[in-house]
Amino acid sequence: MRTFTLIAILTCAVLVIFHAAAAEELEAQDVIETEALATLDEERLFECSFSCDIKKNGKPCKGSGEKKCSGGWRCKMNFCVKV
């Protein structure tokens, strides 16, 4: 009976350790992907807004005095962002 109890306890311990390690790995992957996406979005927003303030493909994103963006651009925080 002692052997069976010891085997059951060891099996549960191994399962808990395995589960914790797998959860840690998944959490680490989620953090890495989230940070990568946030960086990409920030870079894209900066690139689009900076390009839009100057000109994109030789034409301004917004016509003079217009508040709406055109040609696949969308206004976000007073900048044109490529959709």
Curated annotation (Swiss-Prot):
GO terms for molecular function: ion channel regulator activity; toxin activity. It comes from the Eukaryota. Residues 24-44 form a propeptide. Keywords: Disulfide bond, Ion channel impairing toxin, Knottin, Secreted, Signal, Toxin. Expressed by the venom gland. It is found in: Secreted. The keyword Secreted applies. Pfam families: Toxin_20 (PF08089). SUPFAM superfamilies: omega toxin-like (SSF57059). Its main location: secreted. Coiled coil: none annotated. Contains 3 disulfide bonds. Two different connectivities are observed in similar proteins (C1-C3, C2-C5, C4-C6 or C1-C4, C2-C5, C3-C6). GO terms for cellular component: extracellular region. The keyword Cell membrane does not apply. Disulfide bonds join 48-61, 52-75, 69-80. Residues 1-23 form the signal peptide. Belongs to the neurotoxin 12 (Hwtx-2) family. 03 (juruin) subfamily. Probable ion channel inhibitor. This is U3-theraphotoxin-Cg1a.
